[in-house]
Design a protein with these regions (language model features):
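Conserved beta-strand in the GNAT
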Residues: 63, 69-78, 96
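A short helix-loop-beta-strand connector motif used in the catalytic cores of GNAT acetyltransferases and
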Residues: 48-63, 91
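Conserved acetyl-CoA-binding loop-helix of GNAT-fold acetyltransferases
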Residues: 94-97, 103-116, 143
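Conserved active-site alpha-helix within GNAT-family acetyltransferase domains
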Residues: 108, 132-150, 161
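Conserved beta-strand-loop-alpha-helix junction that forms the acyl-donor binding cleft
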Residues: 113, 127-137, 154-156
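Conserved N-terminal entry element of GNAT/NAT acetyltransferase domains
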Residues: 1-15, 23, 162-171
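Conserved GNAT acetyl-CoA-binding A-motif
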Residues: 118-129
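Conserved GNAT-fold acetyl-CoA-binding loop/helix
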Residues: 25-49
Protein backbone atom coordinates (compact mmCIF):
# COMPACT_ATOMS: atom_id res chain seq x y z
CA UNK A 1 0.00 0.00 0.00
CA UNK A 2 1.43 3.34 -1.02
CA UNK A 3 1.62 6.25 1.39
CA UNK A 4 1.70 3.92 4.38
CA UNK A 5 4.04 4.87 7.21
CA UNK A 6 5.26 2.22 9.66
CA UNK A 7 6.75 3.82 12.77
CA UNK A 8 7.32 3.21 16.46
CA UNK A 9 4.28 3.91 18.59
CA UNK A 10 4.47 7.06 20.69
CA UNK A 11 2.84 8.17 23.92
CA UNK A 12 0.59 10.45 21.88
CA UNK A 13 -0.83 7.29 20.21
CA UNK A 14 -2.01 5.69 23.46
CA UNK A 15 -5.69 6.68 23.27
CA UNK A 16 -6.03 5.41 19.70
CA UNK A 17 -4.09 2.24 20.55
CA UNK A 18 -6.48 1.58 23.44
CA UNK A 19 -9.43 1.89 21.04
CA UNK A 20 -7.76 -0.44 18.53
CA UNK A 21 -6.85 -2.93 21.26
CA UNK A 22 -10.50 -3.03 22.35
CA UNK A 23 -11.58 -3.56 18.72
CA UNK A 24 -9.10 -6.44 18.53
CA UNK A 25 -10.51 -7.96 21.71
CA UNK A 26 -14.06 -7.76 20.37
CA UNK A 27 -12.86 -9.24 17.08
CA UNK A 28 -11.19 -12.17 18.89
CA UNK A 29 -14.35 -12.86 20.87
CA UNK A 30 -16.51 -13.29 17.75
CA UNK A 31 -15.34 -16.56 16.16
CA UNK A 32 -15.14 -18.60 19.34
CA UNK A 33 -17.73 -18.27 22.12
CA UNK A 34 -15.30 -19.98 24.51
CA UNK A 35 -12.82 -17.10 24.40
CA UNK A 36 -12.64 -15.19 27.67
CA UNK A 37 -14.60 -11.94 27.47
CA UNK A 38 -13.12 -8.65 28.58
CA UNK A 39 -14.83 -7.02 31.55
CA UNK A 40 -15.41 -3.31 32.18
CA UNK A 41 -12.48 -3.48 34.60
CA UNK A 42 -10.40 -5.07 31.86
CA UNK A 43 -11.35 -2.31 29.45
CA UNK A 44 -10.26 0.26 32.04
CA UNK A 45 -6.92 -1.55 32.35
CA UNK A 46 -6.14 -1.42 28.60
CA UNK A 47 -4.50 2.01 28.81
CA UNK A 48 -2.11 0.76 31.50
CA UNK A 49 -1.41 -2.37 29.43
CA UNK A 50 -0.51 -0.28 26.36
CA UNK A 51 1.65 2.10 28.40
CA UNK A 52 3.53 -0.84 29.94
CA UNK A 53 4.18 -2.27 26.48
CA UNK A 54 5.51 1.07 25.25
CA UNK A 55 7.90 1.24 28.23
CA UNK A 56 9.39 -2.25 27.84
CA UNK A 57 13.02 -2.21 26.76
CA UNK A 58 12.77 -5.62 25.10
CA UNK A 59 9.45 -4.88 23.40
CA UNK A 60 8.46 -2.93 20.30
CA UNK A 61 5.10 -1.50 19.37
CA UNK A 62 4.76 -0.28 15.82
CA UNK A 63 1.88 1.48 14.12
CA UNK A 64 0.80 1.66 10.49
CA UNK A 65 -0.38 5.16 9.59
CA UNK A 66 -2.37 6.04 6.47
CA UNK A 67 -3.37 9.66 5.86
CA UNK A 68 -2.60 10.53 9.48
CA UNK A 69 -4.78 7.72 10.89
CA UNK A 70 -3.45 4.65 12.69
CA UNK A 71 -4.84 1.74 10.68
CA UNK A 72 -2.95 -1.08 12.37
CA UNK A 73 -0.45 -1.96 15.06
CA UNK A 74 1.79 -4.77 16.21
CA UNK A 75 3.55 -5.56 19.47
CA UNK A 76 6.35 -8.03 20.01
CA UNK A 77 8.88 -8.84 22.69
CA UNK A 78 12.29 -10.44 22.80
CA UNK A 79 13.30 -12.87 25.51
CA UNK A 80 16.53 -14.72 26.16
CA UNK A 81 16.41 -17.94 28.11
CA UNK A 82 19.01 -20.54 28.91
CA UNK A 83 16.73 -23.30 30.16
CA UNK A 84 15.41 -24.30 26.70
CA UNK A 85 16.53 -24.07 23.12
CA UNK A 86 16.15 -22.02 21.10
CA UNK A 87 17.51 -19.42 23.51
CA UNK A 88 16.45 -16.19 21.76
CA UNK A 89 12.71 -15.95 21.24
CA UNK A 90 10.58 -13.30 19.61
CA UNK A 91 6.94 -13.27 20.66
CA UNK A 92 4.30 -11.48 18.64
CA UNK A 93 1.61 -10.64 21.18
CA UNK A 94 -0.67 -8.37 19.17
CA UNK A 95 -1.33 -7.68 15.51
CA UNK A 96 -4.42 -5.79 14.47
CA UNK A 97 -5.38 -4.06 11.23
CA UNK A 98 -8.64 -2.13 10.99
CA UNK A 99 -11.31 -4.03 9.05
CA UNK A 100 -11.45 -1.60 6.12
CA UNK A 101 -7.69 -1.88 5.59
CA UNK A 102 -7.17 -5.65 5.63
CA UNK A 103 -5.80 -7.66 2.71
CA UNK A 104 -3.66 -4.75 1.54
CA UNK A 105 -0.31 -5.95 2.88
CA UNK A 106 -0.39 -3.83 6.05
CA UNK A 107 -0.14 -6.79 8.43
CA UNK A 108 2.80 -8.18 6.45
CA UNK A 109 4.55 -4.81 6.52
CA UNK A 110 4.08 -4.58 10.29
CA UNK A 111 5.50 -8.09 10.76
CA UNK A 112 8.47 -7.27 8.50
CA UNK A 113 9.27 -4.16 10.51
CA UNK A 114 8.97 -6.00 13.83
CA UNK A 115 11.31 -8.65 12.44
CA UNK A 116 14.01 -5.97 12.05
CA UNK A 117 13.86 -5.55 15.83
CA UNK A 118 13.95 -9.33 16.32
CA UNK A 119 16.95 -9.61 13.98
CA UNK A 120 18.83 -7.03 16.06
CA UNK A 121 18.33 -9.35 19.06
CA UNK A 122 19.48 -12.47 17.17
CA UNK A 123 16.07 -14.10 17.54
CA UNK A 124 16.10 -17.77 16.56
CA UNK A 125 12.38 -18.48 16.64
CA UNK A 126 9.18 -16.43 16.64
CA UNK A 127 6.08 -17.55 18.49
CA UNK A 128 2.51 -16.28 18.74
CA UNK A 129 -1.01 -17.33 19.66
CA UNK A 130 -4.28 -16.91 17.84
CA UNK A 131 -7.84 -17.93 18.57
CA UNK A 132 -9.15 -21.24 17.24
CA UNK A 133 -11.85 -20.41 14.72
CA UNK A 134 -10.23 -17.16 13.59
CA UNK A 135 -9.82 -18.20 9.95
CA UNK A 136 -8.24 -14.87 8.96
CA UNK A 137 -5.50 -15.30 11.56
CA UNK A 138 -4.97 -18.96 10.65
CA UNK A 139 -4.62 -18.02 6.97
CA UNK A 140 -2.41 -14.99 7.57
CA UNK A 141 0.03 -16.67 9.92
CA UNK A 142 -0.01 -19.90 7.92
CA UNK A 143 0.94 -17.98 4.77
CA UNK A 144 3.97 -16.67 6.69
CA UNK A 145 4.99 -20.23 7.58
CA UNK A 146 3.71 -20.45 11.15
CA UNK A 147 2.58 -23.93 12.19
CA UNK A 148 0.62 -24.79 15.36
CA UNK A 149 2.81 -26.39 18.02
CA UNK A 150 0.66 -26.52 21.14
CA UNK A 151 -3.01 -26.16 21.98
CA UNK A 152 -4.51 -24.45 25.00
CA UNK A 153 -7.76 -25.84 26.34
CA UNK A 154 -10.30 -24.46 28.83
CA UNK A 155 -13.23 -25.82 30.79
CA UNK A 156 -15.57 -24.21 33.28
CA UNK A 157 -14.63 -25.42 36.77
CA UNK A 158 -18.16 -26.72 37.48
CA UNK A 159 -18.07 -28.83 34.30
CA UNK A 160 -14.70 -30.29 35.24
CA UNK A 161 -16.06 -31.26 38.64
CA UNK A 162 -19.07 -32.90 36.94
CA UNK A 163 -16.77 -34.91 34.67
CA UNK A 164 -14.60 -35.95 37.59
CA UNK A 165 -17.68 -37.04 39.56
CA UNK A 166 -19.05 -39.05 36.66
CA UNK A 167 -15.68 -40.78 36.21
CA UNK A 168 -15.52 -41.57 39.94
CA UNK A 169 -19.03 -43.05 39.87
CA UNK A 170 -18.06 -45.30 36.94
CA UNK A 171 -15.00 -46.68 38.75
Amino acid sequence: MRDLLIRSAERSDVEELVRLRLLLQRYMERPNPRVWRITKEGEAHLREEIEEMLAKEDGRMLVAVKDGVIVGFIYGEFSHRTTYTPNNIGRISILHVREGFRRRGIGKRLVEELCRFFASKNVEEVTLNYIIGNKEAEGFWGALGFKPVRIGANIRFERLMEYLSSIDSQS
